[in-house]
């Protein structure tokens, strides 16, 4: 990628795949601002309150809109960023394509994934231990999550750019330094 061209490093994948941990680490290492749907939504929960899954979904949609607003603000001044979310290609592709057209942004996608049982167990433990903001309503989705995780359709966005796939079944085997090296190499192209 042209070093003068801003880049969005997209960290995506299914729930409980380790996206946010990786995105936060990369943000520190690359010194790129991190725009995270869950972080934005948690700020909204703290200010507007939380009550049920429907409300959480509404704030989730608003959080995605805010992610793209913040992305545009950074791209407007030529800054590269990291975006962290379980992006859904049919909805997200047009938004990222729009940014490409408007700002000539480059993309590096990092797609985190694991097997269905591992993802479900991680999510369940996180929900039971209260590892995330209660506004997410994680306990409320446990009944449907396992069947939803059966959808193994690609999480890779249909946008120009490079894709790095990261197997996260065993977090101890995820080589963050290798991922960082790959990203830096792609940024220098």
For the regions a language model picked out, list residue spans one by one.
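Phosphate-binding P-loop
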Residues: 1-5
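Glycine-rich phosphate-binding loop used to anchor ATP phosphates in small-molecule kinases
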Residues: 61-104
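Conserved glycine(s) of the Walker
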Residues: 18
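Conserved substrate/cofactor phosphate-moiety recognition/catalytic segment
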Residues: 21-77
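Hydrophobic anchor at the beta1->P-loop junction of P-loop NTPases
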Residues: 11
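Conserved phosphate-donor/acceptor-positioning beta-strand/loop module used by diverse small-molecule
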Residues: 103-123
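The conserved Walker
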Residues: 15
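Small-molecule kinase domains that catalyze NTP-dependent phosphoryl transfer to phosphate-bearing small molecules
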Residues: 128-177
């Amino acid at each position: 990628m042209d070093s003068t061209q801003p880049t969005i490093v997209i960290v995506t994948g299914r729930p409980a795949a380790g996206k946010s941990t990786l995105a936060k680490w990369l943000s520190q290492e690359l010194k790129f601002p991190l725009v995270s749907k869950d972080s934005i939504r948690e700020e909204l929960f703290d200010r507007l309150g939380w009550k049920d899954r429907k409300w959480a979904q509404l704030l989730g949609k608003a959080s995605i809109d805010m992610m793209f607003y913040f992305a545009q603000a950074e791209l407007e001044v030529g800054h590269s960023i990291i975006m962290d979310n379980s992006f859904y290609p049919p909805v997200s592709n047009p938004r990222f394509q729009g940014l490409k057209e408007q700002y000539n942004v480059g993309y590096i996608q990092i797609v985190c994934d694991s097997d269905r049982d591992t993802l479900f167990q991680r999510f369940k433990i996180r929900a039971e231990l209260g590892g995330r903001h209660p506004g997410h309503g994680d306990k409320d989705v446990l009944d449907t999550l396992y069947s939803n995780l059966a959808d193994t359709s690609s999480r890779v966005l249909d946008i120009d750019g490079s894709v790095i796939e990261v197997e996260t079944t065993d977090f101890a085997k995820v080589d963050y330094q290798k991922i960082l090296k790959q990203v830096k190499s792609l940024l220098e192209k």
